[in-house]
Amino acid sequence: MNTLLELYRHKTWATLRLIEYCLSLDPPHLDANMAGTYGTIPDTLRHVVEAEEDYFSVLTGERLPEPFPAGLVRLEELAQRLRRLAPHWEVLALDTDLPGHTVTFPDGVSWPGAVLLAQAIHHAADHRTHILSLLGARGVEVPRLDVWAYAQSAGLQVA
């Protein structure tokens, strides 16, 4: 078992599960906003997925074939984009050389690959928490997205 790989699988699983959950929400919940969070749920999820694609591009030097569309993006499309990217993140998570490579953002700022790998995990978790906090404050029961829930769903629990 590879720890970084499981962290990336959890990141993808939790974000996809949250998107799927949000598809069942009424517009007043989706369009709500709360101080201390990024914005509405669709705006926050777009930000998460767009950042995933940007982080991937910086780490690999590859531009994704489909640029992120301008304007409103449906939740279903965000989920599709994450599903397409997930196997590529898994390859990166298994690349033992990547953490030590220097990666450079378009603005010229450089970091070790390990920093960007960690940031991608943290960023997604941070914004998922924003969404869960927003929904919880509105009295909406939220899905479990923790590592325990992921491990159970992935069949990782040992008898």
Regions inferred by a protein language model and the residue ranges of each:
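Short, low-complexity N-terminal intrinsically disordered segments enriched in polar/charged residues
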Residues: 1-2
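Short, contiguous alpha-helical
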Residues: 5-67, 107-159
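A short coil-to-beta-strand element that immediately follows conserved catalytic motifs
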Residues: 96-102, 142-143
